[in-house]
Amino acid sequence: FTRLYWGLRGRKFMYPGRKDTVKACIYVKELVCFMLYRLEHHEQGVELYNCTFEPAYTIEQIVATMNKVTGLNRTAPLIPAWILMPAAAVIGCLGAPMGICPARVRKLMVSTNICGKKLADSGYHFHYTFEEAIADWFKDNDNQYLK
């Protein structure tokens, strides 16, 4: 979420096409805790897990949490896809070093809504809520910025 933080902080973040895009995620410290848990409670065979908070969060919920935890209190406009995609194509053709191109914009508008129900039902107890994860990440950076 580092790019999101800097985009919000610099007032450069806009919702690309919609606010309800689901972005499944997990805090890296939580992932490590879960992996250690599975090593201790491993049954025979191979098990696959989608490691994500369950239910997954929308970009609007992620932005609201980022604002709350970091104290940014930024609003972000919604740019309709019919405006954003052609603009991204033009910016991409100009070779502007903004990291904006149609493929990246499309990726931002597509939900990564993977199901974390198996992890949630595994007996593992999360150490962090989503809000606590963002707060811990921010604290690790002296409550000043995110690296």
Task: Locate predicted features.
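NAD(P)-dependent short-chain dehydrogenase/reductase
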Residues: 1-33, 66
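Conserved C-terminal active-site "lid" loop/helix of NAD(P)H-dependent oxidoreductases
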Residues: 28, 64, 87-125
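Conserved loop-to-helix N-cap of the C-terminal "lid" that shapes the substrate pocket in Rossmann-like
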Residues: 19, 24-32, 41-42, 48, ...
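Mid/C-terminal beta-alpha module of Rossmann-like enzyme folds, strongest
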Residues: 37-100, 134-147
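Short, surface-exposed alpha-helical segments at coil->helix boundaries
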Residues: 1-2, 60, 113-116
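Short, amphipathic alpha-helical "lid/cap" segments that border enzyme active or binding sites
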Residues: 28-36, 131-135
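Residue-level detector of short coil/turn "hinge" positions at structural boundaries
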Residues: 74, 126-127
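A conserved catalytic-core signature of glycosyltransferases
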Residues: 20-21, 52, 109, 114
